[in-house]
Amino acid sequence: MESFISFMQEIKKNNVRDALDKAISSGSLHCVVGLVASKDEILFEHAAGFRDEKKISPMNVDSILAIASSTKLITSIAALQLVEAGIITLDDPVSKYLPGLQDLKILDSFDGQELCLVPTKETPTIRQLMTHTSGYVYPFWNKNFFEADKNKTIKNLYAQDGYLEIPIAFEPGSRWAYGIGLDILGEVIKEVSQMSLYEYFSENIFQPLEMHDTAYQLSEEGFKRSVTMMQRLDNSFIASKPFQPSINSSYAKELGGEGLYSTAVDFSHVLQMLLNQGSYKGHKILSDSMIDLMFSNQTGSLEIVDSISQIPSITKDFNLSFGSKSHWGLGMIYHPEGTQYGRSKGSASGAGIFNTYYWVDREVGHCGFFSTQLVPFFDDKVIEAYQEFESSIYS
């Protein structure tokens, strides 16, 4: 740990800063923020570029970001708190808490008009919801669900109680596919806590972690610090109209798998807590044993595989293992062999569709956060910039 902190002296910080600045000066990104922290302190933070389309407002480390699927980490932590408290257990069927999912169906095929639905043998468990082995998928990366969603043949998460009518793509536990399991888990948290997700998160996670800028809804002050969502257009950028931040956000429903706004600094407090075995400034968020479960293989022989895009303008094909053998832990991607860009064996990571990425390396004793606000997800130039950022830290 001490060796890494000494490693992050001014010459090293300059190299990391240069990697971020290069992404802007080369035209690869319109804005970027990067942060590195130990369990006790922020070692490096830097922002570059502009957070608005007209290039008037500079990007800052406290700029408000739509963190999208990075919300899943918060939901996972909340669920593990409930496991610790004995309110739920990891291998309970989700129907124990949401009886409307007792007769869940599998979407076997879709011919453009009719859904072919078959019954499941088992109901997904809490653990399977957390590890993307439940059968719940995103239409973004599943052809049958994309076509059915496009034809409005199935409900989606945004409909009132829509989650009750969403089928799954395969028998729970039989495959791995990135999906909406954490959104379903969010419904479980609301049901057993009798609180909204924001109320639960605020009381049990945000307040003790001093995450004052993290919420589902933007305040007027937060909106003034928010970042315009951009879309790559050849060698330039345009505002991506469907995903713009607003004070009256479309995420009023509060989903467990997406929708939070945060900052690099706020989110780093979560990562620091994970580095410190569940503690942050005297507050114990999770037990040591729960933290260890998060950093362990929870999918057995099921490895992370490619997710093939159905909407290239929003997401590219992606694989979050970054070329190394990876599984899913409880809440994050687990890298038993590390990664080719320097992360240690047993490290963990995650991402959000607007190109937010983070990792936690317990062996070295640091965590990292990198974000722009851009679609499509896993954009080639974003990944190149992210890998240069990470490599400059580990080199």
Spell out what each predicted region is.
Residues 96, 102-342:
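Short, surface-exposed loop or secondary-structure junction motifs
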Residues 30-32, 43, 196, 354-357:
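Short loop/turn microsegments at loop-to-beta-strand junctions
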Residues 319, 331, 351-360:
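Short glycine-rich, acidic/polar surface loops and turns
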Residues 7-67, 87-89, 103-110, 115:
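Short, conserved catalytic-motif segment at the N-terminal edge
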Residues 358-359, 365-374:
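Short, well-ordered beta-strand elements
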Residues 51-60, 377-388:
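A short, polar/charged loop-to-alpha-helix boundary motif
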Residues 14-21, 40, 66-94, 103, ...:
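Active-site SXXK
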